[in-house]
């Protein structure tokens, strides 16, 4: 490609392809401001960067909602918050056999990472429920040794972060959701963003790989999205899941406006240029909102996705996603 035909800001960003070094905040802000007509040029660059500097292949993971609803936090997008009024199934922490059944199904469909997710604030200290989760992790390691076991169980303290590391957790997910300075206004004010960031730091000190990303479509600006990407870089996270809001009836964001497709493409491309070596996953919104365009996101810098369903909304069939991955391989 003759980069002289590109917008100058995109042409300058081709430096990432040659060096593997990320773009600066100023460059990201300029690229974020470009009109939608340049989104595909940006996506093309991001895909090339992914192929040259990414981890290689397509990284699929699946999660299980192991404890649902009655969460005391007031996250505005979440169906599980007791502050909201969504119609969802509510249940306490499931038993080990139920977890093993779901995990085995994922492994049989070629999914390499399986995550246990629980509703609620988290586990700053050891308690009986947290010890049950540790036992589940041990059981999965014993029964399915080839499966990478992950967890997303909220805010942690030093004791619980160290325990998860000892029990061999592969990745821990806790999302920033938005730029740190916008968290209280756009997401929740029953807890602070610093608690989430400190959880990431605790886990990194214990040597645990962290999966940490955000959600778009909750009222943030494009500048806010860029700020979130750079906050993630400062936290040294290895996997970045990006969710697109799926409005759920009974939540404050049930009538939120959809994010333009060109902006979604731009966010994924910028994520790759800010994080050339990380795994960038497309999570919520892939099937329901992107529909025919979900493959485009996987060619805009993403190299992974969440498969098989989400916490309170349905996803796509595991077998369909397995075929999807095989077809995407021809672009690598």
From Swiss-Prot:
Cofactor(s), names only, from the UniProt record: [4Fe-4S] cluster; [2Fe-2S] cluster
Keywords on record: 2Fe-2S, 4Fe-4S, Biotin biosynthesis, Iron, Iron-sulfur, Metal-binding, S-adenosyl-L-methionine, Transferase
GO biological process per UniProt: biotin biosynthetic process
Catalysed reactions, as listed in the record: (4R,5S)-dethiobiotin + (sulfur carrier)-SH + 2 reduced [2Fe-2S]-[ferredoxin] + 2 S-adenosyl-L-methionine = (sulfur carrier)-H + biotin + 2 5'-deoxyadenosine + 2 L-methionine + 2 oxidized [2Fe-2S]-[ferredoxin]
Amino-acid positions noted as binding [2Fe-2S] cluster in the UniProt annotation, renumbered to this chain: 150, 211, 281
Signal peptide coordinates: none
Pathways per UniProt: Cofactor biosynthesis; biotin biosynthesis; biotin from 7,8-diaminononanoate: step 2/2
Co-factor remark: Binds 1 [4Fe-4S] cluster. The cluster is coordinated with 3 cysteines and an exchangeable S-adenosyl-L-methionine. Binds 1 [2Fe-2S] cluster. The cluster is coordinated with 3 cysteines and 1 arginine.
Entry-linked CDD domains: Radical_SAM
Keyword 4Fe-4S in annotation: yes
EC number(s) given by UniProt: 2.8.1.6
Pfam families in the record: BATS, Radical_SAM
Residues annotated for [4Fe-4S] cluster binding in this entry: 71, 75, 78
Segments forming domain Radical SAM core: 53-283
This protein's record includes keyword S-adenosyl-L-methionine: yes
InterPro entries documented for this protein: Aldolase_TIM, BATS_dom, Biotin_synth/BioAB, Biotin_synthase, Elp3/MiaA/NifB-like_rSAM, rSAM
Single Gene Ontology MF annotation: biotin synthase activity
Assembly and interaction partners: Homodimer.
Family per similarity comment: Belongs to the radical SAM superfamily. Biotin synthase family.
Functional note: Catalyzes the conversion of dethiobiotin (DTB) to biotin by the insertion of a sulfur atom into dethiobiotin via a radical-based mechanism.
The protein, known as: Biotin synthase
Source organism of the structure: Chlorobium phaeovibrioides (strain DSM 265 / 1930)
């Amino acid at each position: 490609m003759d980069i002289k035909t590109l917008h100058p800001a995109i042409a300058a960003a081709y430096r990432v392809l040659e060096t593997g070094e990320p773009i600066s905040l100023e460059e990201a802000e300029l690229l974020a401001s470009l009109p939608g007509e340049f989104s595909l040029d940006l996506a093309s660059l991001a895909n090339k960067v992914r192929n040259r500097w990414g981890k290689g292949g397509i990284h699929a993971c699946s999660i299980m909602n192991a404890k649902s609803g009655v969460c005391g936090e007031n996250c505005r997008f979440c169906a599980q918050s007791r502050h909201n009024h969504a119609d969802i199934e509510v249940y306490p922490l499931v038993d080990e056999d139920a977890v093993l059944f779901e995990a085995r199904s994922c492994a049989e469909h070629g999914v390499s990472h399986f995550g246990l997710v629980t509703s609620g604030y988290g586990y700053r200290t050891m308690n009986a429920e947290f010890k049950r989760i540790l036992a589940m992790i041990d059981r999965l390691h014993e029964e399915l040794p080839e499966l990478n076991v992950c967890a997303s169980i909220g805010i942690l303290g030093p004791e619980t972060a160290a325990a998860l590391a000892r029990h061999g957790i592969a990745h821990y997910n806790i999302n920033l959701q938005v730029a740190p300075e916008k968290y209280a206004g756009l997401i929740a004010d029953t807890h602070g963003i610093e608690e989430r960031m400190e959880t990431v730091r605790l886990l990194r000190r214990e040597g645990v790989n962290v999966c940490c990303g955000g959600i778009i479509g909750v009222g943030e600006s494009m500048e806010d999205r860029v700020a979130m990407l750079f906050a993630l870089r400062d936290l040294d996270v290895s996997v970045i899941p990006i969710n697109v809001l799926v409005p759920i009836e009974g939540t404050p964001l049930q009538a939120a406006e959809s994010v333009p497709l060109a902006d979604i493409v731009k966010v994924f491309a910028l994520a790759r240029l800010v994080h050339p070596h990380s795994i960038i996953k497309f999570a919520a919104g892939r099937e329901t909102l992107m529909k025919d365009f979900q493959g485009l996101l996987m060619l805009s810098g993403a190299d992974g996705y969440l498969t098989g369903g989400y916490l309170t909304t349905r996803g796509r069939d595991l077998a369909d996603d397995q075929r999807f991955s095989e077809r995407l391989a021809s672009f690598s």
